[in-house]
Design a protein with these regions (language model features):
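Alpha-helical transmembrane segments of multi-pass membrane proteins
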Residues: 1-242, 246, 254-257, 261-265, ...
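SAM/dcSAM-binding transferase cores
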Residues: 248, 455-511
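Solvent-exposed, non-transmembrane alpha-helical starts
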Residues: 272-276, 380, 461
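Short alpha-helical "patches" and their helix-cap loops
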Residues: 292-298, 461-465
């Protein structure tokens, strides 16, 4: 291998490393958006569009500096390593202390995108320099550059969800990525550009890179303390457990006897009043004959806890996407769910609910007597598909002929369109539906949809052999089916995979 070939290979390797780092910064901000803002389609679109637009802006803004490509490249990579490395910590701290706006994240994305966009013109200029490549064919140079750039992006895209985020978290992961960015700049400066920029400029560049690396090292060391301090400011009660899983940020808080679970910042339950929600969700779907029950979502184990109180229920299949939620249900939340997920009658399946419904494997004879759908609110397209016409059609394949389905459907008062959209979508899927709602102090007015196949809507009833309940009675349930004039039933178009209308209903906000 000639010296020129080695230089070219080393520079292309640096291109791949820088591309990987750039995409990781972008994914870190998208992950942060999901944690702080819910990660809706609008937020994701704004961040991605802002990043892509900034790439073009960076390519234009760097044009006057192409005559000094070597030192400009080192400066850009230094800034990118520092700003990208600090981005997650800075955004998290800003949100925790002063509150945050989506536009702050978009601005951060634009700055990083501008710096990333400047890389390709600079590298193209360096690769065409006689002292660096000796190549005269601009098309071949551009092809090699693009190949290295796209390969690096692939590496970064795979590294973030499977390696960096699970192992390091957002703040430390972004900082380590910044260190890699700085290292790539240092390698290029020492081995490729020293003959171009001169010893004095090289020494200055290395000094700045070293100082930046030391700063990021300090951030890595302090990241746990920074994150725990800033995270605690987002929650009123002391945090007792935290995990950033591959799917979401999970936080458990506790004050006295009140334990609360949050997913991506959204409250899932409070032990102060979750029994109102859980009893209202579970018991109307059971009737007096339900022996096999499918629970989709509900990985906290609270629904399973109530099901196990019914003596005739002999089989519970619990399908939960996130193994981290199951681990917490068996750990810090064990007291809340009475160890339900470790009961031999409960089969825990870690899978996406829709994927599992397509290939559910062995089913109880005749199908499940009851299906309880306890999923987070559909505030993004990933969750929206679990409230779609196609999803409910899959549910019919595993449901017994006379079985009942219950769906947690959000607040009929605060998000009425989303609530009635769920009811209408179930109806379009071939179910006869009875909506009902109860007051849960933590959530406010909260609604459910009880459904069976056919044209005869079920009447919500408390099973005769139900154990003593703290909230639900037949009188409460009868009243729950009545809706006042300011929240009268609506018939809406169904939400589908092609047109997830329910996500737009949620995005429209709370009245």
């Amino acid at each position: 291998m000639t010296g020129t070939t080695r230089w070219r290979a080393l520079l292309l390797a640096a291109v791949a490393a820088c591309a990987a780092c750039g995409l990781i910064y972008e994914l870190a901000l998208l992950t942060l958006s999901a944690s702080l803002h819910g990660g809706g389609i609008v937020a994701t679109s704004l961040i991605v569009a802002g990043y892509v637009a900034a790439l073009g802006a960076g390519a234009l803004l760097v044009k006057p500096l192409l005559g000094h490509a070597a030192i400009t490249f080192i400066a850009v990579e230094t800034l990118l390593g520092v700003i990208g490395g600090l981005s997650a910590a800075a955004m998290y701290v800003a949100f925790s202390f002063i509150g945050g706006s989506l536009w702050v994240l978009v601005l951060g994305t634009a700055v990083i995108g501008t710096l990333v966009g400047a890389e390709v013109p600079l590298l193209m200029t360096l690769l065409q320099r006689g002292r660096t490549t000796g190549a005269a064919d601009a098309g071949r140079v551009l092809a090699n550059l693009n190949a290295a750039d796209y390969l690096g992006a692939l590496i970064g895209g795979l590294a973030w969800p499977f390696l960096v985020l699970p192992a390091l978290g957002m703040i430390r992961g972004a900082a380590v990525t910044g260190m890699i960015n700085l290292a790539a700049a240092a390698v290029v400066a020492v081995f490729l550009l020293r003959s171009i920029i001169g010893r004095r400029q090289l020494a200055s560049a290395l000094a700045v890179l070293t100082a930046a690396a030391l700063g990021l090292t300090a951030l890595i060391v302090a990241s746990d303390g920074i994150q725990s301090t800033t995270r605690q400011r987002l929650y009123a009660d002391p945090i007792i457990a935290y995990q950033q899983s591959a799917y979401q940020e999970i936080v458990v808080t506790r004050r006295g006897t009140d334990t609360r679970l949050y997913l991506d910042g959204g409250l899932q339950f409070s032990t102060r009043d979750e029994y109102r929600y859980t009893e209202s969700l579970v018991y109307p779907a059971l009737g007096d004959e339900a022996r096999s029950v499918l629970v989709l979502g509900g990985g906290d184990g609270l629904a399973a806890r109530e099901l196990l109180r019914m003596p005739q229920v002999g089989q519970i299949v619990q399908v939960e996407l996130d193994p981290a939620v199951i681990a917490l249900a068996r750990g810090p939340l064990r007291g809340a769910n009475a160890g339900a997920l470790d009961d031999p009658r409960v089969q825990v399946v870690v899978d996406d609910a829709m994927i599992w419904l397509r290939e559910p494997g062995a089913l109880p004879e005749g199908g499940f007597d009851a299906v309880i759908i306890d999923l987070p609110d559909p505030d993004n397209p990933v969750l929206g598909r679990l409230y779609s016409l196609e999803f409910y059609a899959l549910v019919t394949r595993v449901l017994a002929v006379d079985g009942l389905v219950v769906v947690q459907s959000g607040s009929p008062f605060s998000t009425p369109n989303a609530f009635w959209r769920t009811v209408s979508t179930l109806g379009s899927a071939g179910f006869a539906v009875t909506p009902y709602h109860v007051h849960v102090p933590t959530f406010g007015d909260w609604g459910f949809a009880l459904a069976r196949r056919g044209t005869s809507a079920p009447t919500p009833t408390v099973p005769e052999d139900a154990p003593p309940l703290r909230f639900l009675t037949q009188q409460v349930l009868d009243a729950a089916t009545v809706f006042p004039p300011d929240n009268a039933p609506q018939v809406l178009e169904p939400s589908t995979l092609d047109n997830p209308r329910i996500v737009e209903d949620m995005r429209a906000g709370y009245r």
